[in-house]
Amino acid sequence: MHIVVVDPSRVVLKVISGLLTPRGHTVDTFTDSREALDFVTDNASVTALITSLEVRPIGGLELCWSARLLADAHRPLYIITMSSARNARNLAEALDSGSDDFIDKPPSPEELHARLRAAERMTGMQRELIRLAETDSLTGLLNRRAFLQRAGEAADRAGAHGRISMILADINQFKSVNDQHGHDVGDTVIRGVAQELLTEAGGIAGRLGGEEFALALPGRTLEEAEAAAGRLRLRCTQLRFKGQRGPVQVTASFGVSTWSEGETVGGLLKRADIALYEAKTTGRNRVVSAATDLILARAG
């Protein structure tokens, strides 16, 4: 686990770090609780926070509460408070402030390791629940809701002057695959195309529904996104699947758009969708960009 430990005493920090590091944990220690909170905020790899109640400038209870707000639906974070004054009031206040557990200070090695094993079990279950809630069960890509959220977060990180581009993809004449070869083969085709989306490094890939997919590309220009869509289009034409009536070959159409200042992810998707429609109605197996005046006018 990646563990942050907060205590005003460097001696206590050294003792706890000495207990945890030999067990394979990554440990960062802080005497300043505000610095600790900033570190936890900026490092999603942190899965456990151990804090004394007697910390400054942010008190231990406030630190628990603030850290708990970071542990949203996408980030497991197990919080353990510790105090040399163990009593019912301190325990209740800590748990009410978002702590998951309470331990004496200084903790005994056996108890500390046991409680961290419990923390590992809990965060492991939380990660699995998050995975199930965000993943499309057929393809392993993000589902629509999770994709929109992740793409929105990427756009927020990019800021007003950042770059993010969007690719929408749709398997051409997919209904005929299901009709001629059955839904099992259709599912295999969907999984095959989905795997191609994962070949674009740094992309956020999702299945929006049916045979439609989306790929958000943070930091990519329109030209770079067009090139990526071109590579994906070519790879899709090279896919072969075993069907009930012989080999199955498919193609896909692609719509591409890029970020405009003040635009939402919804607007980015809308323009990519209009470009995708243009690709499908002008021959299929094409890449069309939303940069043309015609498509921009339709998006407006």
Which residue stretches match the model-derived regions?
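Alpha4 helix (beta4-alpha4-beta5 surface) of REC/receiver domains from two-component response regulators
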Residues: 62, 75, 85-101
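Conserved nucleotide-binding and Mg2+-coordinating catalytic segments in signaling enzymes
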Residues: 130-149, 169-183, 191
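Active-site-proximal alpha-helical element of nucleotidyl cyclase-like catalytic domains
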Residues: 185-205, 212
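A short pre-motif secondary-structure segment
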Residues: 205-208, 248
